[in-house]
Amino acid sequence: MDVGRCFLFLLLPSFFFLPSQTQSTDSFTSVLVSQNGLDFVKNLLVNKAIASIIPLQIPRIEKSMKIPFLGGIDVVVSNLTIYELDVASSYVKLGETGVVIVASGTTCNLSMNWHYSYSTWLPPIEISDQGIASVQVQGMEIGLSLGLKSDEGGLKLSLSECGCHVEDITIELEGGASWFYQGMVNAFKDQIGSSVESTIAKKLTEGVSDLDSFLQSLPKEIPVDDNADLNVTFTSDPILRNSSITFEIDGLFTKGETNQVLKSFFKKSVSLVICPGNSKMLGISVDEAVFNSAAALYYNADFVQWVVDKIPEQSLLNTARWRFIIPQLYKKYPNQDMNLNISLSSPPLVKISEQYVGANVNADLVINVLDANQVIPVACISLMIRGSGALRVMGNNLGGSVSLEDFSMSLKWSNIGNLHLHLLQPIVWTVIQTVFVPYANDHLEKGFPLPIMHGFTLQNAEIICSESEITVCSDVAYLDSSQQPQWL
């Protein structure tokens, strides 16, 4: 991987994404890279860039001249190779339209072969010599400026400026009568310096071009499971400030098979990713609409119905246990087994505030009697369940859990007369606590992927709640290929 490709792989954690076929004009997820994050990326970039270009071959250099009384002289420098490069200092800077990264005070060591020959006309003979040389380049500065623009839901990468400047070169010859030819070979300093500059600049240019092509081949969505993806199209140009860069992403759940984006959600305000003290490298803001789009998708896909036929207190699923609660049920169906059918009547609604993350769930609870091979519905109770949530970051996923706060009931219909709902409350509470909540938590704890670039993982993440959104503030660690999850 060359320098330009390394740069964007490391700098833009949200480059994992490309446009999908449909795009919302609203953004529901924002990714902010702070100055600490930029510095981390810069340091990683420098190390990766050096490793990617070393050894670097420089084109051979030839020089011919004529000297009175000696005749024609030919000097060739070949196998010129940069084998070591050290960066004294570097910085990354954000401009109005792009990113600049500069490495200064750079030194590099090169090896080369030299060959010298000349022919004389008096007497007509040819003299030659050869050897090796060590070259040290000092005071080199390397700069790269990249433009970032939104392009049909993706990001367009362009090279604004690229350069390399060599301040000084020292050449030490070995082999042959090297002491005799040292001065002549020193005349190659300017040419060697120019070749080093142009070769490194060419590598940078090729790298940016390769990466721009590479971005177009990346996946269009992040898969969540077999039924859902995350729409991760960019909704605007990156927002560049003095010490941060922010990417605005659609972020809503989509239906995987049809690539259908749920468009019934609206962002209430412009997201401001705020991490206290800007001490974390990365801030990811997720609007509550993202959670509600997931709820709506799974509701529409009919993944929200449960038949309860086993519970910890199994005797509750027999009419004998209900004879004092609903006498008419026991009278009509004595000692009959039962099951409970729970289905959501509308998508759950998630609400986020500074003090609270919660969800309201509307469900229907149908009481069924099992008579021989028949399932006989006898009553339906409407439930309004209120739960509180706890969020946590697991790897690069945002997951959590829910606990029951309270619930209310109303009778929707009954084939066994009127019901005293207050007598049913302990049973319904038990069912919700032992069946509904654990089922929900089994799915919630898996979470969904946050927009993190391939090869990186969140570290020491914190979650901050604000009005209608949550923000994940985190440092970032880079994983080598042996540590990276296979699905990335």
Swiss-Prot record:
Organism of origin is: Arabidopsis thaliana (Mouse-ear cress)
Q: GO:BP terms for this protein?
A: reactive oxygen species biosynthetic process; regulation of gene expression
Q: Identify the CDD domains for this entry.
A: BPI1, BPI2
GO MF terms, alphabetically ordered: lipopolysaccharide binding
Q: What's the superkingdom here?
A: Eukaryota
The residue range of the signal peptide is 1-24
TM stretches of this protein: none
Q: What name does the UniProt record give this protein?
A: Putative BPI/LBP family protein At1g04970
UniProt keyword annotation of Signal present: yes
**Coiled coil located at which positions?**
none
Q: Which UniProt keywords apply?
A: Glycoprotein, Signal
